[in-house]
Design a protein with these regions (language model features):
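P-loop NTP-binding core
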Residues: 1-255
Length: 255
């Protein structure tokens, strides 16, 4: 049985999509079968994995709103074992369309259910909001990774996200756990980055991943080429960081 992991933080530009793309690619490189669900209308995870959004005929939108078979929405990528269900700009209005649907918070859970038997990991890239699509993702997920960027206001909004997780856990998804807090955009030369690292570790202790995602030029460049950093430059710090993160997650889940 596979594991569904949502990557969520309502604060934008924290490295959420970058982590989704490169963690997925790293897990697949380590011979895990991985499915990415792009649940962000911006569709950056889709383009970052080489999907031409204009050519997508069936996306996560059709699965959630029109009850399309998710298998019709699965696209392969350049990495063996890594597939993706693309997003679409129509997802912007999906939350309004879902308001009158029965069990509207559990639609994604029903959509993804059959896929747990076909993949080792399903990663959901959430939009930077706590709207109905993100609530669906957290209701469907077994756990959540919370990226925290090592910059000013890093912990801004975290308490609101944690409260949302607590509510979802109590009312919709009792098995939801925090997979871990992931420090991103870390630059050890900066005093601020080290201060934030210390603060996050003090607050969340063993929930913080040992792996830290460092600032890296190759990591920033890879999405514009539509490939994960491990294909763009396998020797880069960004590629090595995400491989280490993938191995840490595999090890945690094998215990």
């Amino acid at each position: 049985m596979g594991k569904i992991i949502a990557l969520a933080n309502q604060k934008g530009r924290v490295g959420k999509t970058t982590t989704t793309i490169n963690l997925a690619a790293s897990l697949a490189t380590l011979e895990k079968k991985v499915l990415v669900i792009d649940a962000d209308p911006q569709a950056n995870a889709s383009s970052g994995l080489g999907v031409n959004i204009k050519e997508v005929e069936c996306s996560i939108y059709e699965c959630l709103i029109n009850k399309a078979d998710i298998r019709e929405a699965i696209y392969t990528t350049d990495i063996d074992g890594l597939d993706i269900v693309s997003s679409h700009i129509d997802l912007v209005g999906a939350e309004i369309e879902m308001l009158n649907l029965e069990d509207r918070e559990k639609i994604m859970k029903r959509v993804l259910g059959p896929m747990k038997n076909e993949y080792d990991y399903i990663l959901i890239d959430c939009s930077p909001s706590l709207g109905l699509i993100t609530i669906n993702a957290l209701t469907a997920a077994d756990s959540v990774i919370i990226p925290v960027q090592c910059e000013y206001f890093a912990l801004e909004g975290i308490s609101k996200l944690l409260n949302t997780i607590k509510i979802i856990k109590s009312k919709l998804n009792p098995s939801l756990e925090i997979e871990g807090f992931l420090l991103t955009m870390f630059d050890s030369r900066l005093r601020l980055a080290n201060q934030i690292y210390d603060e996050v570790k003090r607050h969340f202790q063993e929930l913080v991943f040992k792996t830290i995602i460092q600032r890296n030029v190759k990591l920033s460049e890879a999405p514009s080429h539509g490939i994960p950093v491990i294909l763009y430059d396998a020797d880069s710090t960004g590629a090595k960081n995400h491989l280490a993160l993938a191995q840490e997650i595999i090890t945690r889940n094998n215990k």
